[in-house]
Regions:
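Intrinsically disordered, acidic Ser/Thr/Pro-rich low-complexity regulatory segments
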Residues: 2, 6-171
Length: 171
C-alpha cells in the first residue's frame, strides 16, 4: 500500500458540489463544539472511516487535550478488511492519550501511516490519515481518519484535506 500511496500522494480535488456541501454543512454550526462535532461527522460520512478531531489550542494553551470522534461503527462495516478482532482497535480509540499522540505531529501536509508504520501496536492493522488545521505554517489543531489498510487513500486524503481547510477558516 505504501508504494501506491506515495505514487498517488497528490490529493485529488473534490468536486464543486462536494465543496459546497461541506461548506453548507459546517456553516450551520453555531459554536466551537458544534463545529467540531459536525466536522467529525462530516469526515466520517465522507470517508466511511472513524474520524478524530482535536479542538484548537487556545491562547491559554488549552484545547488540544479535548477531541471528538465520529464513525466508530464504520469499523464494523470494514471488519473483514481489518483482519483481526475489533477489540484492540476499539481499546486504542478509547484511550484519549493514544489518539492525541497519533494526531500530535500533524502539520499542514497530509500524512498517511499504514499498518506497521503505526506506533501503537493495537492499530497495526489500520491506516491513519492526518493533517493539521488553522494557519498554514502553525496548525492549532489536527484531524484525521482511521480505517483498514485497504481504503480509498486518494479519496480519504482529499476529504481530510478539504475538511481541515474549511475548519481552519472557521477557527
Amino acid at each position: 500500500y505504501r508504494v501506491f500511496v506515495d505514487k498517488w500522494a497528490t490529493v485529488k480535488p473534490m468536486s464543486a458540489a462536494e465543496r459546497r456541501a461541506i461548506e453548507t454543512f459546517l456553516d450551520e454550526a453555531n459554536n466551537l463544539d458544534q463545529l467540531m462535532k459536525r466536522s467529525a461527522k462530516l469526515l466520517a460520512d465522507l470517508t466511511k472511516q472513524v474520524a478524530v478531531i482535536t479542538y484548537p489550542i487556545t491562547g491559554e494553551g488549552s484545547g488540544s487535550e479535548k477531541m471528538t470522534i465520529s464513525g466508530t461503527a464504520n469499523l464494523a462495516r470494514s471488519g473483514e478488511d481489518l483482519g483481526t478482532s475489533l477489540s484492540p482497535i476499539l481499546e486504542a480509540l478509547e484511550e484519549q492519550v493514544v489518539l492525541l499522540r497519533l494526531l500530535g505531529d500533524a502539520n499542514d501536509t497530509v500524512k498517511v501511516r499504514i499498518g506497521g508504520e503505526q506506533s501503537e501496536s493495537n492499530l497495526r492493522q489500520t491506516s491513519l490519515v492526518t493533517v493539521g488545521y488553522g494557519a498554514a505554517e502553525s496548525p492549532v489543531g489536527a484531524l484525521g481518519i482511521l480505517g483498514p489498510t485497504r481504503m480509498d487513500y486518494a479519496g480519504s486524503m482529499a476529504a481530510v484535506s478539504a475538511v481541515a481547510r474549511y475548519v481552519g477558516r472557521y477557527i
